[in-house]
Amino acid sequence: KFNSNNQENIAVSNGLEISQITTGQDKTTHFKHQYPIPAYLIAISVTNYLTYNHIVDNNGSPFEIINYVYPESYDDAIESTPVTVDIMNLFSNLFEEYPFSDEKYGHAQFGWGGGMEHTTVSFMGGFSRGLIAHELAHQWFGNKVTCGSWNDIWLNEGFATYLSGLVIENFDGVQSFNNWKQSRISSITSQPGGSVYILEDNPSSSRIFDGRLSYSKGALVAHMLRKQLGSNVFYESLQNYLADQNLSYGYAQSDDFIASIEETAQVDLTEFFDDWLYGQGYPTYTIEWSEPAENLARFVINQTQSHWTVDFFESKVTLKLNGTNGESQTIILDNTFDGQEFFQTVLFNISDVEFDPDFDIISKNNQVVLSLTSNDIQNDISIFPTPTNNKFKIIKPRDLTIDSLAIYNTAGQNITTMKYKKYIDVRDFSSGQYFIKFYSDKGLIFKPLLIK
């Protein structure tokens, strides 16, 4: 309610405007919002706004995006806000229909920097695409499902930040998205510690709204979860999280989120979240690779950690192999322990190996080195027959001494280790591709083994 002598004043609040009633010198504007609303998302603003709207088709059930802007900002705003419709459509396609589509969405300009994601109307200090995307994203992650405590603020801010990155991915392309991730990782790893989840009781506002941890690291952990699960399962899991009747239009804590994701994905994510959500810091990788011998290349992944709270960061590691004649091959290795070995079929000579070319892992100061293992001895051993279904013979020169051997599967898991013998029985092995590592007096020798 305000004095109508200022006839140009317009009020905005949550939900739908129901009426304006002028009585004498007073004008009263009524808004109605029919959803449960967290106290910090209640919004009221009155000033000499100019208004204009955009229409979201919403699959035949249209609703308005109403923009309340200062007269002096009108020309710039009306050029900047139409993209809101495109972003709304993107988020609706990835997750679900806008949660308040039977009311409205809107922007109300205010005099602070940044924005505030009040339910159905975000207060905006400007109209950049990134800010529009971030505040709109909160209508799903923060408003429909709200963090259950300030310790869980990443469920709001981490996901809103990640969704602004998804706008870059979908509107600007892969390279721009990679640049965005690289910039975030640089910020995250600028300090050796810090967890996404806020560990301390009664955290300060500066810790709650820490841009490095709650926003950037929260966003990259969301992205790493996507890479861990695969995009299809990731988006399906988030759709189910938002639709969960125990959480929607209510509150969720991190444990609720994890349980919801695990239920859809049908996978135990305890180790992932212990490392990346509750643990502090980041890994540093050293990747050792060998030139292919008999089309078999070996990769060893070593890791150190920046903070003592995590003894090892489990993650899927992507390597891009570049060939001497312009060939390329991308491999994804599920790294679960330090010093893990992987064997991959590579049909060309490798010139160099790129670690995490798309910036999908929070890490820093990584190295890729060529193994000192000599290929000169790789042909000293042969296996016959291959493929085999019962046993195979190891053929070697007399002057080569083999102490022991280990057989690995394609995931780098050690299936068995044994002392050297001329004939190896594999009748109990499942069919598939394996790799043998021989410990000889001349060095390590690697051979592929195919079991039918």
Question: For the regions a protein language model found, what residue spans apply to each?
Answer:
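Hydrophobic helix-coil surface modules that form long, contiguous segments used
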Residues: 1-133, 162
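Zinc-dependent metallopeptidase catalytic helix centered on the HExxH motif
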Residues: 122-179
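Acidic/His/Gly-enriched intrinsically disordered linker/tail segments
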Residues: 157-220, 224-228, 247-248
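Amphipathic alpha-helical substructures
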Residues: 211-299
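Beta-strand-rich binding/interaction modules
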Residues: 285, 289-336, 342-354, 403-407
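Short, aromatic- and glycine-rich surface loops/edge beta-strands on solvent-exposed regions
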Residues: 348-361, 434-439
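Short, compositionally biased serine/threonine- and acidic-rich segments at solvent-exposed termini, linkers
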Residues: 361-371
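C-terminal outer-membrane/trafficking sorting elements
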Residues: 375-384, 388-452
